[in-house]
From Swiss-Prot:
The keyword Oxidoreductase applies. Pathway: Cofactor biosynthesis; adenosylcobalamin biosynthesis; precorrin-2 from uroporphyrinogen III: step 1/1; Cofactor biosynthesis; adenosylcobalamin biosynthesis; sirohydrochlorin from precorrin-2: step 1/1; Porphyrin-containing compound metabolism; siroheme biosynthesis; precorrin-2 from uroporphyrinogen III: step 1/1; Porphyrin-containing compound metabolism; siroheme biosynthesis; siroheme from sirohydrochlorin: step 1/1. CDD domains: SUMT. The keyword rRNA-binding does not apply. The gene is cysG1. GO terms for biological process: cobalamin biosynthetic process; methylation; siroheme biosynthetic process. S-adenosyl-L-methionine binds at residues 224, 300-302, 305, 330-331, 382, 411. The modification Phosphoserine is found at residue 128. One of its GO terms (molecular function) is sirohydrochlorin ferrochelatase activity. Then it catalyzes the NAD-dependent ring dehydrogenation of precorrin-2 to yield sirohydrochlorin. Finally, it catalyzes the ferrochelation of sirohydrochlorin to yield siroheme. It comes from the Bacteria. Keywords: Cobalamin biosynthesis, Lyase, Methyltransferase, Multifunctional enzyme, NAD, Oxidoreductase, Phosphoprotein, Porphyrin biosynthesis, S-adenosyl-L-methionine, Transferase. It comes from Aeromonas hydrophila subsp. hydrophila (strain ATCC 7966 / DSM 30187 / BCRC 13018 / CCUG 14551 / JCM 1027 / KCTC 2358 / NCIMB 9240 / NCTC 8049). Residues 1-203 are annotated as: Precorrin-2 dehydrogenase /sirohydrochlorin ferrochelatase. This is Siroheme synthase 1.
Length: 463
């Protein structure tokens, strides 16, 4: 982070703009909106600046820049077309420890003016640290279209309610009130239509509702790793959670979307190494929900595909704890797509099977004759430890040794690696990758030669 985002209170505080052209006009308009005491220093001024000066909105010093003008200033903006003057302003401001913005010169800025979306008192500021101002403006236009005008009124209303809401003794109940207020569709419509009386009645209803927090658990699929594959609903749940209980397979990029003041509890486990037993996880979810918290149980991939999500929900259902499920993109879909391997294809596979590499006893017990039939795709989850057994059983039951296979390590992530070869090499190929890895078996693997769009540089051919 090159610049810390910071909103400054400049009301009635002296600031200086060096320059009198169109850029100075734009900067002065922003500072006047912030109610700053603006001084313009330039020998010649744009008509708009002269007009503001005549109205008494700003002060003019019609002379060349001299360092004494910086005395007592909180901020200075250099907006001249003379690089040597801008450099002098920057040097003198730095010497006095005054924030300085030199227009179109990021290297000479101790402060950056962002692209702004104004829904006062709600403000959204976007900055590229001066490296791509046009990109910041384009993002502002996109976000501007998403934010309704009444958000400013809603923020003002929230400010008026702060003291009343502080009187609610329970911290979680206070946060629940704010969540209901900001997502209240009827209130939003009333504010947008200017129906102030009706809006106040809606707020009164919310304040009079029982404030007792009722806990619940939401089972959320985090997807296979790439945070861009997290669903919109999943993202919303992470932003609303009081507690997030997560597994080893959840990427740091996904965890970065968790609400900052939410408690994070790691319960990671892998085959043969359960740092937190499943029963303890079930009990943890119960305890947190009974405390009135909104709990997110975050699992890699999809929680209902080899994720033991069903077992956890059974425990919650038996205890009468409210729960819901947000599906995720399962590892088979994500890893195959990011490896250029379509799981089904009319010329190759009319069926796909997802198979766990080990059951709850740690064994791999399968209907091998059914798995060894042609024109299908097999996807083994958690199968690395049994790669040799998978190879032997499939070949023994009739699947040719030349059947293409792929092992996808860290699928969909920047670290993704794909090792491809033949079924008769599977045990050997498994030594070239680490967990978490997925095994894909079937002729669809050959299509990766043409369809690999994501990780060509990280794809290895089998021996």
């Amino acid at each position: 982070m090159d610049f810390l985002p910071l909103f400054c209170q400049l009301q009635h505080k002296p600031v200086l703009i060096v320059g009198g052209g169109e850029v100075a006009v734009r900067k002065a308009r922003l500072l006047l909106d912030a109610k700053a005491r603006v001084t313009i220093n330039a020998p010649h001024l744009e008509p708009q600046l002269m007009s503001w000066a005549e109205q008494g909105l700003l002060t003019v010093c019609a002379a060349d820049f001299h360092p004494e003008l910086l005395d007592g200033k909180w901020l200075v903006i250099a907006a001249t077309n003379q690089p040597e003057v801008n450099q002098q302003v920057f040097n003198e401001a730095n010497r006095r420890q005054i924030f300085c913005n030199v227009v179109d010169s990021p290297a000479h800025c101790s402060a950056i003016m962002p692209a702004i979306i104004d829904r006062s008192p709600l403000m959204v500021a976007i900055s590229s640290a001066g490296s791509a101002p046009l990109l910041s403006r384009q993002l502002r236009e996109k976000i501007e279209a998403l934010l309704p005008q009444h958000l400013g009124q809603l923020a003002t209303l929230a400010g008026k309610l702060r003291e009343r809401v502080k009187a609610i003794p329970d911290k979680l109940a206070r946060r629940r009130f704010w969540e209901r207020l900001f997502s209240h569709e009827r209130l939003a419509c009333q504010l947008a239509r200017g129906q102030q009386q009706a809006a106040e009645e809606s707020v009164a209803e919310l304040l009079n509702e029982p404030q007792q927090s009722k806990g619940s658990v939401t089972l959320v699929g985090a997807g296979p790793g790439d945070a861009g594959l997290l669903t919109l609903n999943g993202l919303q749940q992470l932003q609303q959670a009081d507690v997030v209980v997560y597994d080893r397979l959840v990427s740091q990029e996904v965890l970065a979307h968790v609400r900052r003041d939410a408690e994070r509890i790691f319960v990671g486990k892998e085959a043969g190494c359960h740092c937190v037993p499943q029963q303890a996880i079930n009990q943890l979810l119960l305890e947190q929900a009974r405390l009135g918290k909104q709990v997110v149980r975050l699992k890699g991939g999809d929680p209902f595909i080899f994720g033991r999500g069903g077992e956890e929900l059974e425990t919650l259902a038996e205890a009468g704890i409210p729960f819901s499920v947000v599906p995720g993109i399962t590892a088979a879909s994500g890893c195959a797509a990011y490896s250029g391997i379509p799981l089904t294809h009319r010329d190759h596979a009319q069926r796909v099977q997802f198979i766990t590499g080990h059951d709850k006893e740690g064994n791999i017990a399968q209907e091998w004759p059914a798995l060894a039939t042609p024109r299908q795709t097999l996807v083994f989850y958690m199968g690395l430890a049994h790669a040799g057994r998978i190879q032997d059983e499939l070949q023994t039951h009739g699947l040719p040794g030349h059947t293409p296979v792929a092992l996808v390590e860290q699928g969909t992530r920047l670290q993704q690696r794909v090792v491809r070869g033949k079924l008769q090499q599977l045990a050997q190929l498994a030594t070239q990758v680490e967990s978490p890895s997925l095994i894909i078996i079937g002729s669809v693997v050959t299509l990766a030669d043409k369809l690999d769009w994501y990780g060509e540089a990280n794809t290895l051919a089998g021996v």
